[in-house]
Amino acid sequence: MKLNLKIFSLLLIGLFSLQSSISYADETSETVQLSLVITASDKINLTTVSRVEKGINAYKAIKALVVVGVKDTSYGPQIMSLGGVEAVGNTYWALYVNGAMSMVGAHDVILLEDTFIRLNMEDF
C-alpha cells in the first residue's frame, strides 16, 4: 500500500511539473522581424533588423531602436527627429511600409508580420 502511495505521489508531482512547463510555453510572446531604414541625404543612413513583439505599433518599435523626437498632435505622435536629425522648414519624415507610402502614422501601423519600414526625410 505504501509503495502504491509513493508511486501515485511521484506521478502527481510529475503531472504538475509538466503542466507548469506547458503553461510557460503558451505564455511566450510571438515576435516578428522589423527591418528599419532611416535616410536623410547626407545626414543619416541607418539600417537595422530586429525582432519585435508581434502586435506592437511601429512607433513603439521604432522608438525602441532609435532616438525619436515627436510632436503630439490630435492624430497621434508626429515624428519630428530621428537619431538627432530634425525635420525643419519644408521637410518631413515620410513613412513607407513594405515599399508603399503609408496613409496612416507610425502609431497606427500594427506589426503583425515581418515588415520593412523606411523613414525618409522628404520635402513638401
Regions flagged by a language model, labelled:
Residues 2, 17-124:
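Ubiquitin-like/PB1-type beta-grasp interaction modules and other compact soluble beta-rich domains
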Residues 9-19:
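Bacterial N-terminal signal peptides
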Residues 1-8:
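Bacterial N-terminal signal peptides that target proteins for export
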